[in-house]
Every structure is written in C-alpha cells, then in structure tokens.
C-alpha cells in the first residue's frame, strides 16, 4: 500500500516538473549599440547551473529560465563566436 502511494506521489511530482513551461527571460533592453554587442555563450553547453543560452539585443547570455514567456532562445550555430561582435 505504501509503495503505491509513493509511486503516485512520485508520478505527480515528475509530471509537474516536466509539464511546467520554461522560457528565457524577457530582456529589459530593446536596443544596443553595435560596439556593445557581445556573446558570453554560443550554446546551452556553455552555460552552467541550469541556465540557458538566451538572445538579447546586446548579445547572447546565459540566463536562468522563467515561467513567463517573452524572452528568446538564441539560435547559435557554427558562426557564433564568444566575445564582442563588431
């Protein structure tokens, strides 16, 4: 009996984690001068601690996901380079 209760509780906890939508946070900056654009990362693997590779007007940065939509995941690709983008 206890194992059935545990299994149900575990399943509910697992589903709540899997089904909760996560997004990159919306940037508070709407524009950035070209000389200030830089990429801190070029893929999710560059980020640590559960943060994601997100796009902002000033470049790509590792950001922690939020439950509010509005941000943008970065596209990346082979042409992405870290550092300032001139």
From Swiss-Prot:
GO terms for cellular component: extracellular region. Expressed by the venom gland. Transmembrane segments: none annotated. Contains 4 disulfide bonds. Its main location: secreted. The keyword Lyase does not apply. Disulfide bonds join 24-54, 32-58, 42-80, 47-62. GO terms for molecular function: toxin activity. Residues 21-66 form the WAP domain. Keywords: Antibiotic, Antimicrobial, Disulfide bond, Secreted, Signal, Toxin. Residues 1-20 form the signal peptide. One of its GO terms (biological process) is defense response to bacterium. It is found in: Secreted. The keyword RNA-binding does not apply. Belongs to the venom protein 11 family. 01 (wap-1) subfamily. Has antibacterial activity. This is U15-lycotoxin-Ls1b.
